[in-house]
Amino acid sequence: FRPALIVRTKGTRL
């Protein structure tokens, strides 16, 4: 799992 992927998913969910 990459940290960048989680950050991008959180931004898209917002």
UniProtKB/Swiss-Prot annotation:
Its main location: secreted. The keyword Secreted applies. Keywords: Amidation, Amphibian defense peptide, Antibiotic, Antimicrobial, Secreted. Expressed by the skin glands. GO terms for cellular component: extracellular region. It is found in: Secreted. The keyword Secreted applies. One of its GO terms (biological process) is defense response to bacterium. The modification Leucine amide is found at residue 14. Belongs to the frog skin active peptide (FSAP) family. Hyposin subfamily. Has antimicrobial activity. This is Hyposin-H5. It comes from Pithecopus azureus (Orange-legged monkey tree frog). The lineage of its organism: Eukaryota, Metazoa, Chordata, Craniata, Vertebrata.
